[in-house]
């Protein structure tokens, strides 16, 4: 009786972590010999034993945790989430690659291998060559942090759950970082290199991948155990309670460990993960056309991921989840070198799907080696680490970290190493990418500090979190502490500032002083507002060095574009890439990445339009538009972002953006699959014959939509106006081309002659003579960043805001040089100073600021100022001197030839009768400006419609009637201004007399007479 009573109490002691043991369960299910009865010491011994067989995939520093949650199946890719505390303790950065393995439930009671076989987790105990492969025990995945995960618990994605054999809730897992060797491991005490260490996992590119379909009958038990574990958790029935000897590394779980996400995912798993397939997959794979489509979809589904030989991967096929094993067609070599190699699935990887019989027949029918092909000469990590245009900054940072992170490297010589580096520059230039990429590939431990993550509402917790990061870095030297957006964490201390900010600054100052006594720790901070940082941080001993990353030059943009285009199928030649780099003035690395992304979408839309027009199957536009909108929101740092058929990874310094035919076919296949339709063999064959390739015209179209980041808040208008749209004024056109286009196209000529181009041009003349139109045309022809400013827009009622607006305008122009600043109606902005008697006015202060910006202490390099006015006599004389406005161009009314050209331009869009004579019209419109002629053409068209609304063309009488009604603009008062202010260098001597106004002839006659008078006066005086 007592025994029965004791047994009756057993269910009451069960926890909500695992289901009860069943008589018939696979290895993945919970048994009486599960890891609940294994303490931490035994688990550590198991890790040590397993690391001897797989040293590159498991080590003593592995994290011991339990499966607490399974993410929704909408999250694609293999991912695992740890608590923030575990991430910091293990020095893991979000997005790092880790290996995940299962502890063997029988390791305590037998002498079996301490890790659980994934093959056995699926209920297959048969012997095969895969049993000794690393993929049978380890799965490579990407790690992220989550505030919803408790300490010593993990949350896994559904794909990782399938890869591990569907472990039940509460199952013990080992998580181990598999990044490259740290800097401390590269040197021993004698300073000798240890690069020959075999315990390093190499990540190589895979060209071909062979997958074998796993028999569905072996997966029934795994499916039932996986479902029952979470169902029983939800009903309150679970496995026995965790013993006390494991409580020291297990955090308390919530009362309801199963979330609605798990219930949804399990329910979906029941629907899709079937042991009895509703279709014959062997028949599907035997059909070459359907097999080819499935292989393309599988390649897109698996990208990007890292695999090991022997891994199990899940692939959705026809609304069901199918499990494939990573194999190859030939027998594996006898050596064990593949244990140190993992392979990455990229855009070039070709996936081959086989069932068991098909794979066996293929092995017998081939005499050559068929298997996993690695690109041995190309290391994926090295390719990712290249940052375009930042080679100089990369070298500086490498010298600093190499000299500061190695213990006793400089202190033994009596030198003080650099302890802090401040990287500043505009957003999108690659500051964060530079720090993260270098720290990752140099091997040092990386600790990241983000303001929103450490700021807490409770007093003292923010400072404590910051202190824990620095303490962890000091215990894991060599280490780098990276502080992103330093201005948000440590702003300048001001009287009356926030108390939290002042406490954070004080804590950071103390921590920076503390690491000066610790060897092997370097602080790297990044900001785009260096003036907003606490000045005490920028003194020597804290942030000793400062690295400025500015807007890339044309050479740097070319380097960035070449790196981005390596991952894209394009048809651009080197000359076209250089032209694209020259045309993207002011673009930073993030802007160039966005430009390539937009060009890819332009090419994809063009390809889909062509496919839909030539195919009998209409393509739905809604899924494609949805995919395009989702694609722009993908971030490389987001852990929950779903992968897409077209993968575009955004990095600020030149992340690779690529797409190929595989993604397009996959996108179409997903669309057809979701709508329950079937894809025809003819469409697949037609799409397979052509390969998407981004052309130069795609980039030209993308440039109209992508603007430089620094110019987005400025009114940027580059109208589609060419020189052909401006009639006459050839002299003014030549002057503008010399000042704007020549410096871009003939830089060597200016350097050779030892001069610089004109830096400022003022156009003045009667209203309506195409001054603004020519400024718009020169901006469009030169394809430079064009900042159009109207004088009254810069004035503000607040004191100092007007001068600040002028200063900010020129700062943006310099940051996006070469650029053009166009001041329309500049006489309203730069009026003569001292007119008001009540002191210095707002216009006087704005004028002074404008003079300083045009020709002050800072030289304007790459910034051309073009201004237009019809009242040059109202402008301050200090602004008109050479050095500020080198050329003063009088834009007068057109002559007869110019009027004929203007009439031709305005009448080319209006249907005209054959009786219209442009030469006659030009002769009778003497004294009319370009604006008057434009009005004449419009009024003539209105007059034709007044006669009859069915009128199809205008005639000569309509134009003459309009001329008789419109009076020419008064221009006599402007001729005197041309004699006083015009200053230019004639570019066409043959037309000098025609271009020069009548007043200039009297001035040319007066010059020799004045010389003769001066000579006679000197002769008489002598």
UniProtKB/Swiss-Prot annotation:
Residues 1-44, 230-257 are annotated as: Disordered. ATP binds at residues 425-432, 765-772. Coiled coil: none annotated. Residues 33-44 have a biased composition (Basic and acidic residues). Belongs to the AAA ATPase family. It comes from the Eukaryota. It comes from Arabidopsis thaliana (Mouse-ear cress). GO terms for molecular function: ATP binding; ATP hydrolysis activity; calmodulin binding. Residues 1005-1022 are annotated as: Calmodulin-binding. One of its GO terms (cellular component) is chloroplast thylakoid membrane. Residues 9-18, 230-250 have a biased composition (Polar residues). Expressed in the whole plant. PANTHER family: AAA-FAMILY ATPASE (PTHR23077), ATPASE FAMILY GENE 2 PROTEIN HOMOLOG A (PTHR23077:SF27). InterPro entries: AAA+_ATPase, AAA_ATPase_domain, AAA_lid_3, ATPase_AAA_core, ATPase_AAA_CS, P-loop_NTPase. Keywords: ATP-binding, Calmodulin-binding, Nucleotide-binding. Transmembrane segments: none annotated. This is Calmodulin-interacting protein 111. SUPFAM superfamilies: P-loop containing nucleoside triphosphate hydrolases. Pfam families: AAA, AAA_lid_3. Interacts with CAM2.
């Amino acid at each position: 009786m007592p025994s029965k009573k004791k047994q009756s109490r057993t269910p009451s002691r069960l926890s909500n972590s695992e289901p009860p043991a069943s008589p018939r369960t696979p290895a993945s299910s919970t048994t009486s010999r599960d890891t609940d009865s294994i303490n931490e010491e035994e688990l550590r011994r198991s890790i040590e034993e397993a690391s001897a067989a797989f040293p590159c995939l498991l080590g003593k520093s592995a994290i011991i945790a339990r499966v607490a949650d399974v993410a929704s199946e909408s999250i694609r890719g293999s991912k695992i989430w740890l608590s923030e505390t575990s991430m910091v303790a293990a020095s893991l950065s979000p997005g790092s690659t880790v290996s995940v393995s299962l502890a063997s439930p029988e390791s305590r009671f037998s002498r079996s291998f301490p890790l659980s076989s994934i093959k056995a987790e699926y209920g297959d105990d048969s012997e095969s060559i895969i049993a000794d492969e690393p993929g049978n025990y380890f799965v490579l995945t990407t790690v992220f942090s989550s505030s919803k995960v408790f300490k010593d618990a993990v949350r896994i994605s559904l794909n990782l759950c399938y890869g591990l054999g569907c472990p039940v809730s509460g199952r013990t897992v080992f998580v181990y970082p598999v990044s490259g060797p740290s800097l401390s491991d590269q040197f021993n005490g004698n300073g000798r290199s240890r690069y020959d260490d075999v315990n390093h996992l190499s990540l190589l590119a895979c060209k071909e991948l062979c997958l074998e379909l796993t028999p569905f009958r072996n997966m029934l038990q795994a499916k039932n155990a996986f479902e029952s574990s979470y169902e029983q958790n939800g009903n309150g029935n679970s496995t026995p309670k965790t013993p006390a000897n494991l409580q020291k590394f297990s955090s308390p779980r919530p009362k309801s460990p199963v979330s609605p996400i798990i219930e949804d995912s399990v329910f979906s798993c029941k629907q899709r993960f079937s042991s009895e397939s509703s279709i014959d997959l062997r028949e599907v794979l035997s059909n070459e056309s359907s097999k080819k489509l499935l292989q393309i979809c599988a390649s897109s589904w698996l990208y990007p991921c890292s695999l090991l030989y022997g891994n199990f991967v899940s692939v959705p096929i026809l609304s069901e989840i199918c499990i494939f094993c990573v194999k190859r067609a030939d027998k594996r070599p006898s050596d064990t070198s593949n244990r140190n190699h993992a392979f990455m699935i990229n855009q070039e990887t070709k996936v081959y799907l086989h069932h068991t019989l098909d794979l066996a027949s293929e092995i017998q029918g081939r005499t050559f080696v068929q298997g996993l092909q690695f690109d041995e000469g190309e290391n994926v990590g090295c390719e990712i680490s290249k940052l375009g245009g930042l080679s100089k900054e990369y070298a500086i940072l490498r010298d600093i970290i190499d000299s500061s992170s190695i213990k006793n490297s400089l202190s033994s010589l009596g030198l003080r190493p650099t302890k802090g580096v401040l990287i500043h520059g505009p957003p999108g230039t690659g500051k964060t990418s530079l720090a993260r990429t270098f720290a990752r590939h140099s091997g040092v431990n990386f600790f990241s500090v983000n303001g929103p993550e450490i700021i807490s509402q409770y007093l003292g917790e923010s400072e404590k979190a910051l202190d824990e990061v620095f303490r962890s870095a000091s215990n894991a030297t060599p280490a780098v502490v990276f502080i992103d957006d330093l201005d948000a964490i440590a702003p300048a201390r001001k009287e009356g500032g926030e108390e939290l900010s002042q406490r954070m600054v004080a804590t950071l100052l103390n921590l920076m002083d503390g690491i000066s006594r610790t060897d092997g720790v370097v602080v790297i901070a990044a900001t785009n507002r260096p003036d907003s940082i606490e000045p005490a941080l920028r003194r020597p001993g804290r942030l000793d060095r400062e690295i400025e990353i500015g807007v890339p030059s044309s050479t740097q943009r070319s380097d960035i574009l070449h790196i981005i285009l390596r991952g894209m199928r394009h048809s651009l030649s080197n000359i076209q890439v250089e032209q694209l780099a020259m045309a993207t003035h002011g673009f930073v690395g993030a802007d160039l990445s966005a430009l390539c992304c937009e060009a890819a979408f332009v090419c994809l839309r063009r390809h889909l339009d062509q496919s839909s027009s030539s195919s009998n199957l209409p393509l739905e536009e809604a899924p494609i538009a949805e995919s395009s909108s989702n694609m722009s929101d993908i971030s490389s740092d987001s852990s929950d972002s779903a992968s897409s058929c077209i993968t575009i990874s955004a990095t600020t310094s030149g992340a690779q953006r690529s797409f190929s035919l595989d993604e397009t076919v996959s996108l179409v296949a997903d669309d057809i699959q979701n709508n329950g339709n079937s894809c025809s063999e003819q469409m697949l064959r037609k799409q397979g014959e052509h390969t998407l390739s981004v052309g130069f015209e795609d980039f030209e179209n993308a440039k109209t939509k992508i603007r430089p980041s620094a110019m987005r808040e400025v009114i940027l208008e580059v109208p589609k106006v060419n020189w052909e749209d401006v009639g006459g004024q050839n002299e003014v056109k030549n002057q503008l081309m010399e000042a704007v286009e020549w410096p871009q196209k003939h830089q060597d000529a200016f350097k050779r002659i030892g001069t610089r181009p004109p830096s400022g041009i003022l156009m003045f003349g009667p209203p309506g003579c195409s001054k603004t139109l020519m400024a718009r045309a020169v901006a469009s022809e030169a394809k430079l960043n064009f900042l159009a400013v109207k004088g009254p827009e810069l004035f503000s009622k607040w004191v100092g805001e007007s001068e600040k607006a002028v200063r900010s305008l020129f700062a943006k122009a310099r940051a996006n040089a070469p650029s053009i600043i166009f001041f329309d109606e500049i006489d309203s902005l730069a009026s003569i100073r001292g007119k008001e008697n009540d002191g210095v006015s707002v216009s006087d202060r704005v004028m002074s600021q404008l003079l300083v910006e045009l020709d002050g202490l800072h030289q304007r390099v790459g910034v051309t100022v073009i201004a237009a006015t019809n009242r040059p006599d109202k402008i301050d004389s200090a602004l008109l001197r050479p050095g500020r406005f080198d050329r003063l161009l009088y834009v007068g009314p057109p002559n007869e030839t110019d009027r004929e050209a203007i009439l031709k331009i305005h009448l080319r869009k209006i249907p005209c009768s054959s009786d219209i004579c442009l030469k006659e019209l030009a002769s009778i419109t003497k004294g009319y400006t370009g604006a008057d002629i434009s009005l004449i053409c419009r009024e003539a068209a209105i007059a034709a419609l007044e006669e009859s609304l069915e009128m199809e063309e205008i005639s000569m009488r309509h134009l003459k009637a309009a001329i008789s009604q419109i009076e020419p603009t008064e221009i006599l008062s402007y001729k005197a201004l041309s004699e006083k202010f015009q200053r230019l260098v004639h570019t066409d001597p043959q037309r000098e007399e025609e271009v020069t106004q009548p007043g200039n002839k009297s001035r040319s006659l007066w010059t020799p007479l004045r010389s003769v008078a001066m000579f006679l006066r000197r002769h008489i005086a002598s």
